[in-house]
């Protein structure tokens, strides 16, 4: 989506008295009112994946724990601070992102703690109300709670919609029902192929996640040797009279992380979804897995890439600039104008 974007030397932005942008272009001649800024003037950043609710966990988690270790830390630490402090941390990080040039955030919400901050923030947020649960018998009650959370979000004036978490934390029943509800809204956000443990669990029914779930008496997903993306699509497509009709599934599909995705998964998603996007959170991937997504492969497959920060439980800072820097550091062949596009217009 960003291959035709180019940086404009001596570019200018002309503002009205109230700050409204009224003209942009290449500066031919300076005037007395021209203000020069060293650097690049760009549109507002779009943080396409964030868990702002976890802002109170800054500096708490151990790095390189793997997904199973990360989940254990979440279970122990998520509510380790009082609610008042959690809300204060949310506001502080929302304010910081706005100051750093973020104009919109695709944020994951598991509860309503961020709603009051979002409703008064100058930053636009699209809240994906995320659910998870490994037992099929719990799906109805979880979906009922999701409907109540959605009602609360809408009453606060927040744009929100249902969202599944991922194949490795959900029963087939809950994954399908929450995904259908998300697609009905026109938007779905989904954690995809974030860890090698996820791959092991879905492809072989083995690995640290499988061991952890079994030790806690939890159900594990059915094995799909073709991998998590195939599993996800099989579940939401459905079968027989419940099968989603049409050649492609309509709506905007945001696949998040993709650290261990492959060519077959990318092709399958492109073939199945009408408008797929691929959100990368490289600093989070390094923090948890000491790994990075296959950026060059995604580019070769002409994937629509976006950038996100994830949360302060898996990142040292919520900074779009730092995410862009890490892309430049490890993938120096990617042009700056393309990375800017990922961080802005694609999001």
Region locations from a protein language model:
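Glycine-enriched alpha-helix->loop->beta-strand junction motifs that scaffold or abut catalytic
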Residues: 121-125, 181-187, 248-251, 268-279, ...
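His/Asp/Glu-enriched, well-ordered alpha-helical/loop segment
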Residues: 291-347
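Hydrophobic faces of well-ordered beta-strands that scaffold small-molecule active sites
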Residues: 44-48, 105-106, 125-129, 160-164, ...
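Active-site gating loops and adjacent loop-to-helix segments of metal-dependent hydrolytic enzymes
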Residues: 56-88, 126-129, 196-250, 272, ...
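Active-site loop-helix segments enriched in His/Asp/Glu that coordinate
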Residues: 81-161, 165-183
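C-terminal helical cap
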Residues: 88-97, 277, 281-288, 330-347
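N-terminal metal-binding scaffold of metallo-dependent hydrolase/deaminase domains
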Residues: 1-30
């Amino acid at each position: 989506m960003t291959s035709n974007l180019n940086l404009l030397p001596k570019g200018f932005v002309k503002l009205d008295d109230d700050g409204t942008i009224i003209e942009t272009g290449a500066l031919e001649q300076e005037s007395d009112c021209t203000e020069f800024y060293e650097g690049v003037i760009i549109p507002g950043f779009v943080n396409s994946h964030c868990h702002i609710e976890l802002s109170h966990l800054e500096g708490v988690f151990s790095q390189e724990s793997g997904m199973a270790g990360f989940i254990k830390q979440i279970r122990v630490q998520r509510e380790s601070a009082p609610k008042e402090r959690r809300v204060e941390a949310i506001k502080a990080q929302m304010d910081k992102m706005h100051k750093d040039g973020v104009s919109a955030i695709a944020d994951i919400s598991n509860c309503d703690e961020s709603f009051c901050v979002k409703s008064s923030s100058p930053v636009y947020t699209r809240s994906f109300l995320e659910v998870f649960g490994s037992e099929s018998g719990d799906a109805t009650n979880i979906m009922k709670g999701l409907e109540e959370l959605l009602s609360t979000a809408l009453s606060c004036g927040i744009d929100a919609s249902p969202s599944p978490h991922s194949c490795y934390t959900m029963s087939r029943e809950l994954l399908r029902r929450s995904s259908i509800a998300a697609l009905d809204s026109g938007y779905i956000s989904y954690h995809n192929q974030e860890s090698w443990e996820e791959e092991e669990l879905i492809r072989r029914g083995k690995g640290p996640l499988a061991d952890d779930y079994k030790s806690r008496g939890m159900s594990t997903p059915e094995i799909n040797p073709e991998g998590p993306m195939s599993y996800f699509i099989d579940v939401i497509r459905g079968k027989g009279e419940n099968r989603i009709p049409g050649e492609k599934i309509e709506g905007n599909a945001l696949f998040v992380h993709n650290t261990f995705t492959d060519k077959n998964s990318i092709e399958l998603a492109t073939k199945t979804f009408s408008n797929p996007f691929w959100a990368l959170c490289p600093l989070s991937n390094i923090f948890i897995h000491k790994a990075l997504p296959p950026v060059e492969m995604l580019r070769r497959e002409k994937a629509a890439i976006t950038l996100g920060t994830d949360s302060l439980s898996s990142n040292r800072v919520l900074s779009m600039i730092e995410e862009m820097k890490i892309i430049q550091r490890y993938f120096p062949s990617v042009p700056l104008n393309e990375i800017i596009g990922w961080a802005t217009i694609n999001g």
